[in-house]
């Protein structure tokens, strides 16, 4: 190992260099070493000889580089540069310098430094460093300004190339120069940095010292020796009596030798009797002695055997339940006994209470005689031996947490100490994978247990929180989750109860409750009052007295004092066993916990399946270039094998998945619950196939029902030929149609090349015989359970299609989170391979694998591969393609330098950073390996110019389609003199049956009139905009005229300025619409006459024949529904029926929109040849529009369905693309302006309409009104029909009538506007009895208002007429204005003949007469003069409704509007027209 010191611009850093690693030094915070203002990036790495280099320059002890602000000094230290010296033992000051008298001599130093106060370092934990002002001293890599500084144990000191480390017993030194010293050297080895796996811990095989269990039997003593109770005199007396009788007989009757014989025999009998007696007595005594000796030897041996067994038991107990002091040694030495107990061991959850006389582990058998009259001391000896070994004295007393709740009673501080001992014991011997603790305790007791926070067992990993509940917040945060966990475990047991299968829950939870008040009102109380042992939960209660304990407690422990405790009951049985608790006063509990906290328990060996492996690691490369994709594409052939790496079984043991039909394929299932890595394994497989096979050999069609997440990842992959996301019913059918179309296409190509299998076709394609690429198509559904639930018919058809498509190269991979109830027999039988990751329960595992194994998987990415009927069944770790892609040395590794504080709950809390990341100068997202590989493949595809495969699945129609993407939209290029047939590009159509998407084009001749039916807000107006601009861009304004009827919400108003638009109508413009109807009817008649005249059938034929330009007429109606109930409904509908019936041949076309089909009358609707349905709230209405359809119209703005044989679906185009710099209306205005500027020809005329107000002065110049007056006419206003000038010819008699004098006065004003011109031409005489012309009395030749004056006017008229009759016309004509004709007659009594003469002859002779009067007065008068004048005059202005006047008999006008101010009717030649007088 090497250490590198980097110095630059008063910045000092140290780096521990590890062989094989690379490091970066720069000013970037993400670098391994950050130096401010460095100005360059330095890469550190080893060359092939192991020499460390900085940017390819070797570092030989010291390397100096030029920096922006200062030299960069790199000092490399090796083990040879290391030394360690003890502090001087006598003095309290030492020096380090270049001088011979220094305690530590280093020649390279310029000045000495002084180390002081090291004798008291054990108490103070620091020494003092003294140096002069010329010496730079760094402590912990910070330059010190003071001359005296403290350096604590573990601190690093740097002085002029010398590195020092302060230790409690001395100094560690790194120096490239020789260090000479008389101080004691402590070690010569440089302390190595801990290996990456230093803290990893693996269980060793456990050594179990079993307690003796063999029975020891103490046999009863043998039966006592039976003593011969015969007395000696019984053997002697009979012979003696015989001798005595013989002597008596001899004395009475001597019998010779016979007596001798009798006496001899008797004597012998006596001798033998005496000897026999003493012989038997001696034997008896010997037998008794032997019996006693043998049995006592037996008891002695038994005693030894029992004692040995007791010692073995005591040893076993002491070994497996050591003292806490011994436990400290176990942890300190990282002994293999740590975590030795598992849930499968007999002593799982066993711990020591203290020292007591415990029951023997073996049975001592002895049967005492029930009754014996004689006392046998040997029986007493055996009984004494039996009773002596009743217990094992001073042995550990063991308790366990497996058999119901336990409780501690006594003083709380004593109980807490016992719980601490239990914590230590269980934590040392049980892994935190198997055991966790949860303490519910009082807040004031948390400090006592604070040391336990270091124990990994105190972290509840399922909740990511420390297992301490001591207040309301922690209660709510933890207990609710624990409640849910208990509930789940109870449910799991109930589900397994039918199978009689035992469940072992992991981890076991030890639930310690020292304060019931925290859970008394929590829902978890219902479970706390039960025995939860069956569910992997051990309950421990703490109370002061036994009366406070819950009734379901099985084991009770009474802690009486620190030296006395009692096990009262055990498993509900009374025990009353006293014990002595262990004293742990001198044990550092936190030290044990901290040492244990450093260990990372790895349950599986590293040379087995790795926990994770990245995609590139699986391929054993670091950079995507090393994948050698091009060669793989060139060498791999799908017809031989399709095996690609998917994961690893172990180190360097690749597992491949081969979906060749004769291997693992072609179809399969993937199952895995949320977080199992299901999507990731599919991603890795897709990526692996893409790396190994050319896009012409392998392609993917992704069905991602969850929403397109996976589809987005592969959108740039050339192998991806389609994605299906978020399917509704119609999209499902569309997808199925596309897939079936692909099958038909493949079958057609197979038939063309006389092959019947994809492998044969691929071989022909490789040989160049077949030219169209046809890759294996992998249809992959990421969540088919939901798809099957929502679209069962689609799923059924998909599986069936895949089955049919086996030989066509179709592969189906179905993935699901929960296979239970989803994988039916059809899916199972068609799936040869199964990949099972972590599933929710055993039922799911059985469903996919027919074994429960997958339910036991815990790691993401871990999976079982099953092929066929267990032909292959392997566990492996799948590759993870989501890892960050980084090329060593190419860019800086991003390091999270956030500082976290571990809070009271054991959770990480950032304390130095704004978590938003917005404060960073640059927020950059790292590229994943998947993205890097896809980018690499994309670059290869571009470089090799690989032709894309025809896509079997085209994406769903976009939600925005633009006209410019479908057809040329530059009108400058499209306008021409040649009249073209009209083609309308409506949008983008989708034809899945033909695997085609393209412009939706209608030829107007064939399409006829168009009706679009759709709900409001779904793009009806946009549809019309699209047509308007499509027509306008392809035809000049003189070739296409448009009439826009906007009966909606003024949606057509923005396009009214297009030069092609003749006029624009709204629903409230009744007069204008009525006028348009008349114009359309006239135009129809005019065009029909043309056809008849030239004997052609259509206007297009007329154009070809004559070359004349007759424009196409487009009538576009938005929201035809508004026609109903409108005042003009009948006439408008009649006109539309006529237009739709006759207009097509006349090049007059109708396009309309409506919200329902019955908005039109049946005859009109029948004439609408092209019908289009958009989204309709009433689904049945779609059928009314387009008939029976395969696909419904999606609830998408702009989506439509065209009535045709196949009912083509399309999306309506928009005239302009969205531009953030311009609004839609601005874009319209820009194009309209461009058209207007570009086009210089004639534009269509609008419908002439009467302005709301017409002032004489406004029209005086434009209409040359003075000239008209000079030519003998009075301009009075405009007519409503043509909005043309209306005038009264003064050369003809005229009559003007109105309803009231006020309007007569206004008429007088208009008539006299050009009085000066009139005076020049006429001699004006006015008879004004009512005074309306009074203002002009001084401006005319004669003016009369009085009766006599009026008579004079009458005489003047007659004389003037006579004179003209005699002399002929005068140079100056006369103009007589008779205002109030009725009064004039009454005053003058003018005869009828005079009236006739004035009307008939006056104009010929230059005498012009104008009658003015109130209409009612003229009608009500019975004067014949008025009737004569009315009948003879042909010029009238009548200021009342035609229906109300009585001058003429006209046809009654229904709903004739009231005459407004300044309005009137001009009547001439028995015809009338409505006019408005000038103001």
From Swiss-Prot:
Bilayer-crossing regions: 230-252, 257-279
All ranges on the Cytoplasmic side of the membrane: 1-229, 280-1479
Limits of the FtsK domain: 652-846, 997-1183
Extracellular topological segments: 253-256
GO CC terms, sorted: plasma membrane
Highest taxon, organism lineage: Bacteria
InterPro entries from the UniProt entry: Firmicutes_EssC_C, Firmicutes_EssC_N, FtsK/SpoIIIE/SftA, FtsK_dom, P-loop_NTPase, SMAD_FHA_dom_sf
Residues annotated as binding ATP: 672-679, 1014-1021
Family, similarity comment: Belongs to the EssC family.
Subunit text: Homooligomer. Interacts with EsaE.
Protein name: Type VII secretion system protein EssC
Taxonomic source organism: Staphylococcus aureus (strain MSSA476)
Lineage of producing organism: Bacteria, Bacillati, Bacillota, Bacilli, Bacillales
Gene: essC
């Amino acid at each position: 190992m090497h250490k590198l010191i980097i110095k630059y611009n008063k910045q000092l850093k140290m780096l521990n260099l590890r062989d094989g690693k690379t490091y970066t030094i720069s000013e970037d915070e993400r670098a391994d070493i950050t130096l401010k203002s460095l100005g360059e990036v330095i890469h550190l790495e080893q060359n092939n000889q192991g020499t460390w280099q900085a940017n390819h320059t070797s570092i030989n002890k010291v390397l100096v580089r030029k920096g922006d602000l200062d030299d960069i000094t790199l000092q490399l230290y090796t083990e040879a540069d290391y030394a360690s010296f003890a502090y001087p033992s006598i003095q309290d000051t030492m020096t380090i310098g270049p001088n011979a008298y220094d305690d530590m001599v280093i020649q390279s130093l310029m000045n000495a430094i002084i180390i002081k106060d090291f004798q008291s370092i054990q108490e103070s934990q620091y020494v003092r460093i003294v140096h002069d002002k010329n010496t730079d001293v760094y402590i912990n890599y910070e330059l010190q300004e003071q001359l005296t500084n403290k350096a604590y144990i573990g601190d690093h000191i740097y002085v002029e190339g010398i590195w020092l480390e302060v230790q409690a017993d001395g100094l560690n030194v790194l120096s490239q120069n020789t260090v000479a010293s008389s101080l004691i050297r402590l070690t010569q080895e440089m302390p190595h940095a801990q290996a990456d796996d230093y803290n990893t811990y693996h269980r060793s095989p456990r050594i179990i010292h079993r307690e003796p269990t063999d029975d020891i039997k103490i046999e009863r003593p043998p039966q006592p020796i039976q003593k011969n109770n015969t007395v000696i005199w019984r053997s002697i007396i009979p012979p003696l009596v015989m001798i005595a009788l013989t002597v008596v007989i001899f004395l009475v009757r001597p019998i010779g030798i016979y007596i001798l014989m009798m006496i001899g025999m008797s004597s012998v009998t006596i001798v033998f009797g005496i000897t026999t007696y003493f012989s038997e007595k001696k034997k008896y005594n010997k037998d008794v002695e032997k019996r006693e000796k043998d049995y006592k030897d037996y008891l002695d041996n038994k005693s030894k055997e029992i004692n040995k067994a007791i010692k073995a038991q005591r040893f076993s107990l002491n070994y497996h339940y050591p003292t806490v002091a011994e436990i400290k040694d176990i942890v300190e030495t990282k002994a293999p006994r740590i975590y030795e107990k598992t849930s499968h061991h007999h002593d799982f959850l066993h711990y020591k209470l203290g020292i007591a006389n415990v029951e023997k582990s073996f049975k001592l058998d002895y049967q005492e005689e029930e009754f014996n009259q004689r006392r046998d001391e040997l029986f007493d000896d055996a009984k004494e031996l039996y009773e002596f070994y009743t217990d094992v004295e001073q042995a550990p007393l063991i308790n366990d947490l497996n058999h119901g709740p336990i409780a501690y009673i006594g003083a709380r501080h004593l109980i807490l100490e016992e719980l601490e001992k239990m914590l230590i014991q269980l934590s040392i011997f049980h892994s935190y994978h198997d055991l966790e603790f949860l303490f519910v305790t009082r807040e004031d007791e948390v400090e006592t247990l604070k040391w336990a926070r270091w124990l990994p067992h105190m972290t509840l990993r399922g909740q990511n929180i420390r297992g301490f509940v001591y207040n309301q917040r922690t209660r709510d945060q933890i207990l609710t989750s624990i409640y849910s966990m208990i509930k789940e475990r109870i449910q799991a047991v109930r589900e397994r109860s039918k199978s009689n299968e035992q469940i072992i829950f992991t981890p076991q939870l030890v639930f310690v409750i020292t304060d019931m008040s925290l859970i008394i009102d929590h829902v978890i109380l219902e479970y706390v009052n039960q025995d939860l042992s069956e569910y992997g939960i051990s309950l421990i209660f703490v109370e002061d007295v036994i009366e406070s304990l819950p009734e379901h407690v099985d084991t009770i422990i009474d802690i009486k004092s620190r030296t006395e405790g009692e096990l009262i009951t055990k498993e509900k049985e009374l025990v009353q066993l006293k014990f002595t608790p262990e004293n742990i006063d001198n044990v550092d509990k936190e030290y044990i916990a901290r040492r244990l906290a450093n260990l990372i328990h790895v349950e599986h060996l590293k040379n087995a399946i790795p926990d994770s492996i990245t995609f590139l690691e699986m391929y054993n490369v670091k950079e995507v270039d090393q994948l050698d994709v091009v060669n793989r594409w060139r060498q791999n052939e799908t017809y031989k094998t399709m095996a690609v790496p998917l994961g690893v079984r172990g180190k360097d043991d690749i597992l491949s998945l081969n979906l060749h039909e004769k291997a693992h394929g072609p179809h399969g299932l993937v199952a895995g619950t949320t977080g199992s890595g299901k999507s990731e394994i599919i991603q890795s497989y897709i990526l692996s196939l893409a790396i190994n096979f050319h896009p012409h050999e392998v392609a993917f069609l992704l069905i991602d029902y969850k929403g397109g997440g996976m589809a987005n990842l592969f959108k740039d992959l050339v192998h991806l030929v389609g994605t299906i996301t978020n399917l509704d019913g119609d999209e499902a059918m569309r997808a199925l149609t596309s897939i079936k179309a692909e099958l038909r296409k493949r079958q057609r190509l197979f038939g063309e090349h006389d092959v019947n299998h994809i492998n044969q076709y691929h071989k022909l394609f490789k040989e160049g015989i077949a030219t169209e690429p046809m890759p294996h198509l992998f249809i992959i559904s990421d969540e088919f359970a939901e798809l099957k639930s929502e679209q069962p018919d689609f799923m059924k058809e998909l599986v069936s299609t895949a089955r049919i498509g086996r030989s066509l190269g179709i592969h189906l991979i179905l993935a699901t989170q929960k296979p239970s109830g989803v994988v039916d027999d059809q899916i199972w039988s068609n799936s040869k391979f199964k990949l099972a990751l972590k599933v929710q329960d055993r039922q799911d595992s059985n469903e996919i694998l027919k074994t429960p194994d997958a339910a036991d998987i815990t790691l993401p990415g871990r999976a079982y591969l099953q092929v066929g009927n267990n032909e292959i069944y392997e566990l492996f770790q799948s590759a993870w393609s989501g890892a960050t892609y980084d090329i060593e040395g190419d860019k800086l590794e991003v390091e999270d330098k956030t500082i976290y504080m571990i809070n009271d709950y054991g959770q990480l809390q950032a304390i130095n950073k704004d978590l938003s990341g917005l404060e960073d100068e640059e927020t950059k997202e790292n590229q994943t390996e998947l993205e890097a590989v896809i980018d690499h493949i994309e670059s290869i595809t571009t470089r090799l110019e690989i032709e894309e495969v025809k896509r079997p699945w085209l994406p769903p129609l976009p939600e925005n389609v633009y006209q410019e993407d479908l057809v040329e939209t530059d009108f400058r290029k499209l306008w021409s003199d040649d009249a073209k047939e009209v083609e309308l590009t409506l949008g983008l159509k989708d034809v899945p049956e033909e695997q085609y998407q393209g412009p939706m084009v209608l030829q107007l001749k064939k399409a006829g009139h168009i009706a679009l039916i759709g709900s409001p807000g779904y793009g009806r107006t946009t549809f019309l905009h699209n047509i308007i601009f499509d027509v306008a861009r392809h035809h000049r304004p003189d070739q296409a005229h448009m009439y826009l009827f906007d009966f909606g919400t003024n949606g057509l108003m923005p396009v009214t300025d297009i030069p092609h638009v003749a006029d624009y109508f709204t629903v409230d413009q009744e007069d204008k619409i009525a006028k348009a109807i008349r114009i359309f009817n006239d135009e129809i008649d005019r065009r029909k006459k043309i056809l008849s005249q030239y004997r052609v059938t259509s206007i297009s034929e007329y154009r070809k024949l004559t070359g004349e330009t007759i424009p196409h007429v487009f009538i576009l109606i938005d929201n035809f529904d508004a026609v109903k109930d409108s005042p003009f409904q009948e006439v408008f509908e009649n006109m539309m029926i006529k237009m739709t019936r006759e207009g097509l041949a006349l090049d007059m076309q109708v396009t309309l929109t409506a919200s329902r089909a019955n908005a039109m009358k049946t005859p009109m609707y029948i004439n609408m040849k092209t019908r289009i349905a958009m989204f309709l709230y009433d689904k049945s209405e779609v059928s009314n529009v387009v008939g029976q359809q395969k696909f419904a119209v999606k609830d998408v703005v702009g989506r439509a369905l065209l009535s045709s044989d196949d009912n083509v679906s399309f999306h309506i185009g928009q005239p302009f693309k969205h531009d953030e710099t311009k609004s839609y209306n601005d874009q319209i205005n820009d194009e309209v302006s461009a058209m207007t500027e570009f086009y210089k020809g004639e534009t269509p005329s609008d419908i002439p309409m009467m302005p709301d107000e017409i002032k004489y002065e406004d029209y005086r110049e434009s209409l040359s009104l003075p000239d008209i007056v000079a030519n003998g006419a009075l301009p009075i206003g405009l007519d409503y029909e043509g909005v043309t000038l209306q005038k009264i010819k003064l050369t003809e008699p005229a009559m003007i009538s109105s309803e009231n004098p006020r309007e007569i006065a206004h008429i007088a004003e208009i008539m006299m506007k050009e009085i000066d011109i009139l005076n020049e031409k006429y001699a004006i005489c006015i008879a004004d009895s009512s005074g309306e012309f009074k203002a002009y009395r001084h401006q005319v030749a004669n003016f009369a208002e009085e009766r006599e004056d009026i008579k004079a006017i009458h005489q003047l008229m007659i004389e003037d007429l006579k004179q003209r009759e005699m002399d002929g016309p005068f140079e100056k004509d006369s103009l007589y204005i008779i205002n109030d004709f009725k009064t004039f007659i009454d005053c003058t009594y003018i005869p009828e003949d005079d009236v006739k003469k004035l009307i008939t002859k006056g104009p010929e002779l230059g005498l012009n007469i104008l009658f003015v009067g109130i209409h009612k007065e003229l009608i009500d008068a019975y004067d014949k003069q008025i009737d004569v004048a009315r009948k003879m005059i042909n010029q009238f202005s009548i200021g009342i409704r035609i229906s109300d006047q009585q001058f003429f008999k006209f046809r009654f006008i229904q709903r004739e509007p009231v005459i407004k101010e300044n309005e009137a009717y001009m009547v001439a030649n028995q015809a009338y027209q409505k006019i408005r007088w000038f103001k």
